[in-house]
Amino acid sequence: MAFLEDGNHTAVTEFILVGLTDDPVLKVILFTIILCIYLVTVSGNLSTILLIRVSSQLHHPMYFFLSHLASVDLGYSSSVTPNMLINFLAENNTISYIGCSIQFGSATFFGVLECFLLAVMAYDRFVAICNPLLYSIKMSTQVCVKLVVGSYIGSSLNASFVTVSIFNLLFCGPNKINHFFCDFDPLIELSCSDVSVPVAVTSCSAGLITMITVFVIAVSYTYILITVLKMRSTEGRHKAFSTCTSHLTAVTLFYGTVTFIYVMPKSNYSTDQNKVVSVFYMVVIPMLNPLIYSLRNNEIKGALKRQLGKKIFSQSNILFCKS
């Protein structure tokens, strides 16, 4: 039952997700591709988290933040991808009203948390390169925990506030969401209430978070660039740049796609383009981040080799003892 009588109004009890395509063949192809991407996302991010936890060489603030970023990427992708995979195979792509609110709230929470963590990681690189002698004091365990906990609290408050403001609106039909998940714009289009206040509040909130985090990242890297250019050692410059390249790549990919969807005027792109870009930043980027941070990072590659070496050595000892 998609509608429920509520006084003088008919309230929506479930939504229909239009998805990416109606073509049955294309659905199978997309299901296979996105399933493979999701499996790589889960394995890659879990491996990053476990490697940082078990390797004492990686017990540094930078990797502490990276492990939380991996957790966020895992949660971000999982808030949307499993449901999208089910809808590729299902005939009736419905999601309950409560399910839609949970999906929207989860996606908002992890999206905002990613912004905060990327800003925190930029600040960490700034302190490491510009104030190396004070790094252990400025980025102590206590400070790192406070930064992460603050990011989680801020994201939770924002997600709760935005979700409540949207799902307090009246939805009385139609109930087709022209997207593959419960996103802000498609939901607002379905409301039969006055949406001016929720739209203004949500836009201000998103704009403020984006501006603050981008400002922190931009200022951090401006000081980093100035410091690196003053270095006389070519090796020192190369080492400093190499520690920042991965983070800058992740920042560019994430903020580039988010800006395309939430900052650019809606008249500049179609709904289908919006869907494609959404797939990129919610499904593809969480898969790419572990690769971006590990491929150019000698410490992570070294820790992985040591852990694999220990595993092989212990297994060979077991086989030797048995023989």
From Swiss-Prot:
Keywords: Cell membrane, Disulfide bond, G-protein coupled receptor, Glycoprotein, Membrane, Olfaction, Receptor, Sensory transduction, Transducer, Transmembrane, Transmembrane helix. Residues 50-57, 124-136, 221-240, 296-323 are cytoplasmic. Its main location: membrane. Residues 1-28, 79-102, 158-199, 262-274 are extracellular. Glycans are attached at N8, N92, N268. GO terms for molecular function: G protein-coupled receptor activity; olfactory receptor activity. One of its GO terms (cellular component) is membrane. Disulfide bonds join C100-C192. The chain crosses the membrane at residues 29-49, 58-78, 103-123, 137-157, 200-220, 241-261, 275-295. It is a multi-pass membrane protein. InterPro entries: GPCR_Rhodpsn, GPCR_Rhodpsn_7TM, Olfact_rcpt. It is found in: Cell membrane. Pfam families: 7tm_4. PANTHER family: OLFACTORY RECEPTOR. Potential odorant receptor. Belongs to the G-protein coupled receptor 1 family. This is Olfactory receptor 5P58. It comes from Mus musculus. The lineage of its organism: Eukaryota, Metazoa, Chordata, Craniata, Vertebrata.
